[in-house]
């Protein structure tokens, strides 16, 4: 919970967030380390701390899990320059760098931006990376290619500053057919492409929407909201 049961008191985390979510990584580089409040705010920029003193993790947001060849080369270059030449690929289609040093975070983020890559909203109480089926564009069973839907949804949500500070993280998934390869039933919102015949007998494409799924301390399978 973000709030204590006594509503007159707000958690220290909420107090930090109420003071604004802006973080200057160039200032962090000048200081050589993240301060207490900065460690919390860095999550909104896709940066986590580590059990190892002085080491950080950065999560690159990749809507739909698809990168260009230029972006792939950029990811490799950033890993080699800042992250010991290693990356992790997450179950929600992000890329993570580890063993990052605080003074280098600003330069790392700038290098990613050269190929339109970002860690923004990679962590924290925000709408996280929007996921799509791994083979959204090519699967023979797809009702529709859901990759453009995932990318456009991510673009719209990332631009909404009033969604920067949600009560908890929020996860969205698009799946191209009922097989649900994008794991729609374990996300906050899962949109599963379906088809039906309209009055003229033509196929219409829409979505079956399930909500409330998750794999936290208490796992829940999403329930259908509408189709």
Language model regions located:
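Charge-rich, low-complexity segments
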Residues: 1-45, 184
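Intrinsically disordered, low-complexity regions
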Residues: 2, 22, 114, 163, ...
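Small-residue-enriched alpha-helical segments and adjacent helix-cap loops
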Residues: 26-34, 50, 55-204
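Short glycine-enriched loops at secondary-structure junctions
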Residues: 125, 213-215
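FAD-binding subdomain of flavoenzyme oxidoreductases
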Residues: 183-184, 207-213
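Internal alpha/beta scaffold segment
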Residues: 215-227
């Amino acid at each position: 919970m973000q709030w204590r049961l006594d509503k007159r008191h707000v958690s220290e985390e909420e107090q930090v967030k109420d003071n604004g979510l802006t973080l200057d990584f160039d200032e962090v580089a000048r200081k050589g380390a993240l301060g207490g409040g900065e460690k919390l705010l860095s999550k909104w920029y896709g940066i986590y701390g580590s059990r190892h003193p002085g080491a950080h993790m950065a999560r690159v947001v990749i809507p739909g899990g698809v990168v260009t060849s230029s972006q792939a080369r950029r990811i490799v270059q950033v890993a080699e320059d800042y992250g010991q030449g290693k990356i992790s690929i997450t179950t929600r289609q992000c890329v993570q760098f580890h063993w990052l040093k605080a003074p280098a975070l600003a330069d790392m983020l700038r290098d990613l931006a050269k190929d339109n890559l970002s860690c923004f909203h990679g962590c924290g109480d925000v709408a996280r990376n929007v996921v799509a089926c791994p083979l959204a564009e090519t699967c023979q069973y797809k009702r529709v290619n859901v990759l453009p839907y995932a990318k456009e949804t991510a673009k719209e949500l990332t631009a909404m500053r009033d969604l920067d500070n949600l009560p908890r993280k929020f996860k969205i998934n698009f799946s191209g057919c009922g097989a649900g390869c994008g794991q729609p039933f374990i996300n906050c919102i899962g949109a599963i492409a379906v088809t039906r015949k309209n009055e003229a007998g033509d196929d219409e494409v829409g979505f079956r929407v399930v909500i409330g799924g998750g794999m936290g301390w208490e796992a829940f399978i999403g329930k259908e909201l509408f189709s």
